[in-house]
Amino acid sequence: MFNFFNLSLRLNGFPIKEASVELEKILAVSENEYSNYINQKKKEIVEYHLKHNKSYQAFVGKNSFANWSELPIMTKKEFQKPLKERLSEGYPPSNVYVNKTSGSSGDPFIFAKDKFCHTLTWANNIRCFGWFGIDFNTSLQARFYGIPFDFIGNKKERIKDLLGNRYRFTIFNLSDAVLEKVLIKFKNKKFDYINGYTSSVVLFAKFLQKKNMVLTTVCPTLKCCIVTSEMLFDDDKMLLEKQLLQKYLAYASRS
């Protein structure tokens, strides 16, 4: 089958083949050498930013360091400034991957990564999802995320859904009547996995609980559920495991 997902990454400037090769090199680092490898990478990252990132230079207050422990700890509050003031030299806003957190902690967080770094994240996502039998090129995703209302943003997400083999459910209205339609869609489509906001997926699980129903009884192809890095309470985790699939529950950041 044609790899539409991999193609969409490449068309958007994300070199997935090269990133996969780099990931294999990282995974090949032996357990005995891993601590030294991490310390060396930490040193390289800090030295790079002290040399090429004016915002980080100002935050640290000097252009060199001797020990990791002497570096000040950054929080989201230190990032509350325009993105262009935080980017390193050679990385204009037009040539980086930009995203943001939900701000559920009280401090919104808009961040950027260079495209190779972000592709490396995708390469690792592909590897980890594979543990549960999920292939981004072929597996059907039930997606519980919002979508932009503006025309261009909306169409862009719809195209990504098409290429990524994703069916997107609305999260702006999750009344019982709407969730009943969601359930019908699960009965009629062979979804392989769920990916969405914690709050939205938990609400769907509570709806199923009221109906005394486990989702895999109507959608037996379902393999796993992935929720975003919002706070997931133990009770909610058990609820998801009980009402959705009784198999696996992965917990990861949105990418």
Locations of the language-model features?
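Nucleotide 5′-phosphate-binding alpha/beta core
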Residues: M1-K100, G106-S139, I147, I184, ...
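AMP-binding/adenylate-forming
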Residues: T119, L140-V202
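A generic local structural motif
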Residues: R127-F129, E180-K181, L208-V214
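Short, glycine/charged-enriched secondary-structure capping and boundary segments
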Residues: K155-I159, L208-K210, L240-K242
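Active-site periphery "cap/insert" segments of enzyme catalytic domains
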Residues: K187, S199-K210, S229-D234
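Adenylate-forming
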Residues: V201-T221, L239
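Gly/Ser/Thr-rich phosphate-binding loop
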Residues: L222-S255
